[in-house]
Amino acid sequence: MKESETGRIEVSPGAIASLVSQVVLECYGVVDMASKDLATDLIERLPFDNRRRGVDVHIGDDQIVIDLYVVIEYGTRIITVAQNIQSTAKYYVEKALGVPVAAVNIHVQDLRISAD
């Protein structure tokens, strides 16, 4: 991902997904992360570390593409929440890694009334 004088620095897609998941869950209007399909949902319910749920990271030639599967709070303006998620995720990944984010694709999987 990055070359330095002493060698190459690689950050795994899983590490990036953990960062993005934490940042997205703090965004206004996001209730939860979601699975992209039923098979993935069943796997993610197993008792493993679930911090990467709802995040797919694709690392290409010096750029990153992120797909996010989210549950949005019912009654919020979906497009505004989605745009906020995009800009927030892009900012934090670029700040942490110094690598451009080519796209942050938002997939709204459900709407839910938050527990607050």
Language-model features and meaning:
Residues M1-I78, Q83, K95, V99-D116:
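Contiguous, often N-terminal, cationic amphipathic patches that form binding interfaces
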